[in-house]
Amino acid sequence: RQMCIRDRSQTNLFNEQFADEYDTILMLMNGSGIIGKLENLPDFFRKMKLLLRPGGCVLMDSSNLSYLFEEEDGSIVIDLAGDYYGEVDFQMQYKNVKGDSFDWLYIDFQTLSLYAAENGFTAKLVKEGTHYDYLAKLSRQA
């Protein structure tokens, strides 16, 4: 028997018309990336409040890029006056075809937890990976 998808859409997560409700929102394969920049986190959490049913959650993975700034002695040197070290400017290319550049956010768990708390969510560390990566569960505060 042939199976097919009957109801699909390609939608910008932040589009106002995207307003269904979900028990769980999966944001995997560095799911935090779509947020783009730290300054977009309040908008992200506002949108999650609209999309999540009561008791629902977001499962999101990301990575802490601080290891890229690690010195030989193990210290980490980050310019605190500069942009957040997990904000990355991506541009995809295949052979001679280049796409437009776009913002992508890698966020460490502590920073995610801080922004979650500031926006009415709790962040729980579900699993730590072997290379600075993690899975987090974001739930609305009661």
Segments (PLM) and residue ranges:
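A short SAM/SAH-binding and catalytic strip from SAM-dependent methyltransferases
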Residues: 22-42
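A short glycine-rich, Lys/Arg-flanked "PGG" loop and its adjoining helix->strand segment in the class I
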Residues: 39-57
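SAM-dependent methyltransferase
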Residues: 54-113
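A structural preference for short, hydrophobic beta-strand core positions in alpha/beta folds
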Residues: 10, 60, 125-126
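Core SAM-dependent methyltransferase catalytic element
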Residues: 115, 119-142
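Short, small-residue-biased leader/transition segments that mark boundaries at the very start
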Residues: 1-5
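Conserved SAM-binding strand-loop segment of SAM-dependent methyltransferases
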Residues: 6-15
